[in-house]
């Protein structure tokens, strides 16, 4: 299998899924394919980021983060540096999940906080990439009481009548979320958490070795 085999994000993710299910010995036998997949994955990410940045006149660099705090993380945006960092474990969650993470972080370049403008920008990017349907976005305000009797004001966004961003507070750090109506999150990981963790550790070791042997020259934090 060569790098050309990984001509789409879907093929990269399918390989990563199968890699997780291999025995430790079989994982080592897939070292060359893992490196090829990683290079192709970076190329696909480059293409998506460049396309969005060109369309919206943005500047953005990106790099992998193979550091310690990547469990459960997907990406981070450093808007003051015009940079995003992506955690390689995203490859185990599906191609549309990767696209969603990237577009989410790109929306943070001009909107650091999870507020109205951010979510509308995020939705617009998803629509431009045809990952969400076109349509009217409407906002609904909801006031609820917490267990201490305080009134909290939440906002939600609907796309074509379907809930798409669920409950964020405009004046706090409470993070809203894209709901299950977003088809990007309909992709469930096809392997267990434990298998995914083992696969991630093996992938990290392979990529570290490839970097040391100068098989990889892409920039990443490790």
Q: How would you name each of these model-derived features?
A:
Residues 1-100, 109-160, 165-171, 175, ...:
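Active-site-proximal or metal-binding-adjacent scaffold patches in catalytic folds
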């Amino acid at each position: 299998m060569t790098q050309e085999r990984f001509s789409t994000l879907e093929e990269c993710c399918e390989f990563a899924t199968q890699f997780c299910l291999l025995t430790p010995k079989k994982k080592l036998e897939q070292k060359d394919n893992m490196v090829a997949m990683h290079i192709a994955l970076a190329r696909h990410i480059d293409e998506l980021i460049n396309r969005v940045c060109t369309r919206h006149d943005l500047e953005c660099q990106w790099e992998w983060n193979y550091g310690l705090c990547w469990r459960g993380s997907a990406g981070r945006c450093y808007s003051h540096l015009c940079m995003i960092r992506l955690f390689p474990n995203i490859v185990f969650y599906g191609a549309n999940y990767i696209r969603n993470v990237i577009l989410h972080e790109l929306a943070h370049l001009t909107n650091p906080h999870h507020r109205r403008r951010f979510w509308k920008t995020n939705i617009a990017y998803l629509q431009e990439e045809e990952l969400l349907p076109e349509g009217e976005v409407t906002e609904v305000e909801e006031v609820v009481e917490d267990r201490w009797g305080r009134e909290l004001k939440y906002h939600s966004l609907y796309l074509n009548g379907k809930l798409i961003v669920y409950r964020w507070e405009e004046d706090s750090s409470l993070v809203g979320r894209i709901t299950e109506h977003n088809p990007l999150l309909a992709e469930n990981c096809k392997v267990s958490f434990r298998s995914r963790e083992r696969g991630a550790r093996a992938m990290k070791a392979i990529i570290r070795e490839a970097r040391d042997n100068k098989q990889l020259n892409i920039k990443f934090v490790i």
